[in-house]
């Protein structure tokens, strides 16, 4: 009645019927991989075309499929029906959370972003990895590897995080306790790698930067990219699984050394007086103004028939009830000189930067204050010292 107000986010709740059977894909993935690696033939006598040729198996997923790999592991599907392992190694890339596969009316996916399915079921699964992880917000115990640790079927596990995961996808609870007061010790079979100064979608290089001033406040994208890093780490995972070669230690921001902080503690340098080409015309970039926006992480109650620690059951309270207890969100601290983050794996573009790659952006819609989904920002350096001093830009010049 009277139309929609763009200042609000609307969620439609309705009575549905005839839910599909969901979660079968987890069993299908388990049984398919197990068949190819260890069976001579299927139950109909059809020969396995690669019987005896597979010595090790690696599973990899990016973003939503990475979340699904974590759900696969969390729910115990890395134990084959014969008791053996399904995957010897697993790499969940830019995958901060889990996904909604195992509930009635499940909708696999769900962004969990501020304006992209903020109350997705996949938000309720444990973020901590360790089998003894204690969630002090919900009071629940047990992390992602709890089931596989019980059955001795845990894979060697890599988790990769871009910078956007911290701002928009609540990435920090995998690194700290739920209240954000101490760094977590990670399982021996796991490594976590933070790709410094990157956005969720990768890209990289100045050619990947686009600027639509009516859509985003700053040029969209990050020159810093994780593509080469991801490939190198995947080979490290293979070496760990196949040859027993220890991979690099986890590289993440930490509370202990001041590289993981509350959003309000960030300290960016002044970035002023720059332009970027829009349709062949040099267009002014607004002077950078840090607003401290991030996607919060409240504890939701979906009703007594929903089992959050199993990502299972029936949601009877929709929209879910906000219990008023939020998980702490922390973000990587930046270098006061360049604005690039201080921790994590720094690619060539971060070691020899052409400007500041920022892990978030803001929408440019008048009257709306919000993060620009999963995109980052790029603000170039001035070409000369004289130009940057005249503009009041505190960063180095090219």
Give names to the regions the model predicted.
Residues 1-398:
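C-terminal His-loop and adjacent cap/lid subdomain of alpha/beta-hydrolase
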């Amino acid at each position: 009645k009277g139309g929609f107000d763009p200042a609000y986010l609307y969620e439609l709740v309705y009575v549905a019927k005839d839910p599909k059977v969901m979660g079968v894909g987890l069993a299908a993935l388990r049984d398919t991989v197990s068949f190819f690696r260890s069976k001579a033939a299927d139950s109909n006598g059809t020969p396995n075309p690669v019987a005896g040729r597979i010595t090790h198996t690696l599973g990899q997923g990016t973003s939503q499929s990475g979340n699904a790999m974590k759900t696969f592991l969390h729910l115990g599907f890395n134990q084959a029906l014969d008791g053996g392992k399904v995957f010897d190694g697993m790499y969940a890339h830019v995958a901060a959370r889990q996904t909604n596969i195992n509930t009635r009316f499940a909708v696999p996916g769900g962004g969990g972003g501020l304006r992209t399915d903020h109350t997705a079921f996949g938000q309720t699964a444990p973020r901590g990895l360790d089998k003894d992880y204690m969630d002090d917000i919900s009071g629940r115990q047990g992390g992602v590897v709890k089931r596989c640790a019980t059955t001795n079927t845990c894979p060697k596990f890599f988790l990769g995080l871009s910078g956007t995961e911290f701002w928009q996808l609540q990435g920090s609870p995998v690194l700290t306790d739920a209240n954000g007061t101490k760094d977590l010790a990670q399982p021996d079979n796991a490594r976590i790698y933070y790709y410094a100064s990157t956005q969720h979608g990768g890209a990289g290089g100045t050619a990947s930067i686009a600027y639509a001033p009516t859509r985003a406040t700053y040029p969209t994208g990050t020159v810093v990219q994780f593509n080469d890093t991801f490939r190198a780490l995947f080979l490290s995972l293979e070496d760990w699984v196949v040859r027993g070669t220890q991979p690099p230690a986890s590289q993440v921001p930490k509370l202990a050394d001041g590289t993981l902080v509350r959003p309000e503690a960030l300290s960016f340098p002044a970035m002023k007086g720059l332009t970027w080409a829009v349709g062949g015309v040099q267009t002014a970039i607004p002077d950078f103004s840090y607003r401290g926006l991030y996607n919060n992480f409240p504890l939701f109650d979906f009703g007594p028939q929903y089992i959050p620690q199993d990502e299972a059951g029936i949601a009877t309270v929709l929209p879910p009830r906000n219990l008023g207890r939020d998980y702490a969100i922390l973000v990587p601290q930046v270098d006061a000189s360049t604005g690039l983050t201080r921790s994590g794996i720094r690619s060539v573009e971060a070691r020899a930067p052409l400007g500041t790659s920022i892990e978030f952006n803001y929408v440019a819609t008048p009257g709306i204050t919000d993060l620009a989904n999963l995109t980052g920002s790029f603000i170039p350096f001035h070409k000369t010292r004289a130009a940057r001093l005249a503009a009041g830009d505190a960063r180095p010049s090219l």
